[in-house]
Amino acid sequence: MNNTEQLFRYAPKLKQLSEQVLFADVWQRPLLSPRERSLITLAALAALGRTEQLPFHLTLAEKNSLTKEELGELFTHLAFYAGWPAAVSSLSRIEPQE
C-alpha cells in the first residue's frame, strides 16, 4: 500500500472526490488537453512548494506526452516566477521517475 492509499484509508470521501470529480470530471473537460492540464498542475505544485505530490503528477505528465526536456523547460521558466528554490526542488524530482 503506497502513502496515498494509506492516507485515503482515513479519508475515503477525499478518495472518492479525487477519483470521481477531479480525475473523472475536471481532468476530462474538453477545453484543455490532458497535456495542458499536466503542465498547469505541475506549475502550481512547484510554485506552491508541494513537491510531495510531484512524483505522481510527473508520471502522469509523461503519460500525457510531456518529455523530460519539456519538464526541464517548465521548471526553468517557472524559476523566474516562483523562485529558484521552487524550480530546483521540483526539477530534482524528475530523475527518480526513470
Predicted regions and their residues:
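Acidic, glycine/proline-rich low-complexity segments that act as flexible tails and inter-domain linkers
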Residues: M1-R35, A47-L48, P55-N64, E70, ...
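Short, structured motif recognition centered on aromatic/hydrophobic residues
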Residues: R37-L45, L74-F75
